[in-house]
Structure formats: structure tokens, C-alpha cells
């Protein structure tokens, strides 16, 4: 739960792609600007609300490097880069986003604080998407547009389900005496309001914590800087909206919510909601099956149970939702690799089969006895219930892998996992395989990178991050302004042309570059190397060039 309360006064986290080829690290640059900066801090941008503010923003020529104009560009508004329903307007090779209130920023990714003047008195101020872009939720018995009027606390009776209301000496205080089977401040919570498992799917109406504190609404202005609020990516998927009901979007132990402490400070607490009893849960009948001595592959590949919304906040450097990249693997060493890189996570990978992980060859200069692969990991410093850990039985490095002038060529390897209790990875919401590509994706396709942002100094984020990048044609990537014929046919380039430096260097060496088609994700590249992080695109191993080798290696070792 560390990320819920992180200090959020940071530029976007940039991570160095590859090994030692990169000219400098933006991690180091950020640290030089702010000595107190740590890579576990995230930025959820917001601005003070100004009704007259021009919410349109144009990316100008000065913000783009010279190489941006070396080739005819596709329509910069396809796909629409404007978030939260913003309209994209083309201006030559650039674009302008016309933002709907209360959003602003060059891509409408920022949420304006429409509650800064505290217009709600004895109530909560909530940010909305319709004029005046806020509304007041009054604390009973206060009422009125600004929660300044008072009504009798027990007339009419605010208590529900036949409960009786008792007035206290203070006119604003009251107690509801709940009948059996009901609880809550207004006796509104029935006995059937319970959660199953860890409560990830809980959609009940409990809004108080175990310490009987009232939950904040998810669209409260106090939560603008938190990782979890109504304006986060996939909010609807996690049951988060304009309410203050408990939820468990990060798959913690049980549902939780934010509460106000003092001076507009917030913290989180677990909620006063119970786990469902066995009789409350209907389990489907299982038909008998024949015993199997061999674990089959997963039912499907490239499918995530975390749906993507069409309206999103910015990706670069933000904490990823648990289960969004279920094929992401963390390669971890039991020994320090260098003086500056301690033991633990050092590279990424992609699960392509229950017993096989795809990674970069330059990540495999380590003995198998010192190597561990962790699947389903979200927080590197926290042992999570959905993690699956395996030792590595064997490393298969591509035979023609080599490094020339510190640039890796044919940078691809396979890790064969050592089974635990007779099986390798088990499919879950947090652990799934990604598909191997069956064709090419065109230049300009928007793809995803993910990882913990490890640099050559060993520094990075404890939380899994993700970013979006676009595929770039090798002809452009080999131009003099970029890599000047350093890119061969085993490599592909990807970056963010509209805003270089924001997403290009995210991810870990060996981590996946995934592209989506018809709701299925394919591992199209492997994070390999790059020069001048943030100024030039990242370079990835092109997986399609090695499909025959991948399939032949797995077949020869697995017998199928």
C-alpha cells in the first residue's frame, strides 16, 4: 500500500534502456535537480482551477528534435492523443488538444482543482465533469448548496431499515440504533454486503473503516495527488467512481479507502466489511477430470483481465495497475552484479509459455544458481500473494548474439524455468502468457513497454511502471539525426514522436514491448539498448526475426 501515500512532486520517471550504451541517465539528471528525489515518487498532475484558463495546448517546433521532421509524418491526431474526451486539432505536423473542463494540459491529462476555495463548508467538495465542475456532499444534518443550513437531525428520520434515530446534546450529532443484520452510520449496510477472496471484485456500499472513520469520495479534491481516484486509468474497471464506497483496486488484503486526517492530509485504512461466509458464495460444480502428468499450456495468450478505457490519463512513468501486464517477469539475482547494482531485480522478461521466459541476451551473463524469475510482481519491496517464483533450469542465448562497440546485436535469450511441485507458472489474473507475433505491426503503431525502470546505476522504481510508445520505421531510425545506420534488421525502434523524452526510456532491459491487435497482446520487441535517453527512440530486439529459433528451442527442450 506504499504507493497510495507517495510524495507526488516529481517529474516523470525516466529509465535508461539497455546496458552501457546510453550516453546519460535521466535518473541522475533528476537527482541533480532535487537531491531529495527518489524513484518511488510519482506525479499525478493537477492545477488550480481558473475558469478563464485556455485549456488548449500545442506542441511546437521548439519542443521537437530536428529528426522529427526528417520524414513525412502520419496524422498526429490518429490515434487521438488527447485524453479525457479532448478534441485533437491538426496544425501541420503538430496538434492541439481542446480540453473539456475540468481537464487541462497539452494532452488534457491534468485535473484542475475546482475545490481550491473550499465552497462546501460542512461538507466534502467533489470534482465533477459538468458545470460548475464541483458539487458539495453535505454531512448530515447540514444541507443547502454550500452545506451551510442545518435541519433537525432526526426529523425526518435519516436512519434506514427500520432503525431509530437518537439526538445528542450537540444539535449536529445523532445515533442510529440498527436492527439485527444491519450496520453503518444510517443502518444502510446489510449482512449480505461482504467480499470474496481479497475483495478485488467487491462492489458493496460499505463506506467506513475498521476505526469507524468516514471514507472520502473517490472524486474528492483531496485525492488528486493519490495514485487511486476517479480520474485514474481503469477507474471504472475497479469499481471506482463518484462515490465513497470501499474498494480494493490494488489487490491488497481486503477493501480499503482513503480518510481525511488533518489539514487536508489523507491516509488509507482497511474497511469495516466482512468476508463472505461459505454459504454466501455459490461455487460452480466441478466435473471430474482425468488426472494429468503434464501441465498444459494456458487457455489463451495475450489476454489481460484489466480492460483498457478509451479515456486515459498519461502513461509515462506512472504506477501500473496490478494485472495489467500479467506476462511481465522480474529477473532477480541472489548476488550483487556490480558495486552499484545490489542483489535483487536487474532485468525484465516476458512469459511466453508456463515454463519459458523471453528476455535480452545481455541480461543472461549470470549463473543459473544465482538467478530467480518472479512472475505477477507489482511491488519489488513487498511479497505479494499473487507472486510466483522460480529458479532457472537453463539459459538459452541466441548463438549469433554479439556486442560490437557496446551495442548488442541479436539480443535475445530464453530462460527455462525449473518446475515447483511438478509445474511451472499457474495461470491467474496476475500471471498470464503473452502471444508471439504472427505478423508485422506497421510503423506508427502504438505499443506498450513496462518495467521497474532499472538504470545502469541500479536505481529504479519499486512499483511496476508502464508507458506507451510508437513504432518507428528503421529507415527513419537509421537517419543521420538518429542512429546513423547503427540499426540492423534484428532491431526495431520505438518512442514518442510528439513528446520525445517522456516515454522513450521507460522499462527494463529484457522487458517486453507489446503491441495489441483485436484485444490480444503480442510481444513484438525486447528492450535492448539506446543512445541519449529521452532524445532518441529506444532500440528493441525484433521478435519476429527469431520466431523459428524460439519455437525450435522450446520444442526440443519440452518435447512438444
From Swiss-Prot:
Tissues in which the protein is found: Ubiquitously expressed.
Protein origin, superkingdom: Eukaryota
Top EC group: hydrolase
Domain named Kringle: residues: 193-276
Cellular localisation: Secreted
Disulphide linkage map: 77-88, 82-97, 99-108, 115-125, 120-136, 138-147, 154-165, 159-176, 178-187, 194-276, 215-257, 246-271, 301-435, 347-363, 355-424, 447-515, 477-493, 505-533
Any one of the GO BP annotations: proteolysis
All residue ranges annotated as the EGF-like domain in the record: 73-109, 111-148, 150-188
Family statement: Belongs to the peptidase S1 family.
Record's disease association: Thyroid cancer, non-medullary, 5: A form of non-medullary thyroid cancer (NMTC), a cancer characterized by tumors originating from the thyroid follicular cells. NMTCs represent approximately 95% of all cases of thyroid cancer and are classified into papillary, follicular, Hurthle cell, and anaplastic neoplasms.
Name the record gives this protein: Factor VII-activating protease
Organism: Homo sapiens (Human)
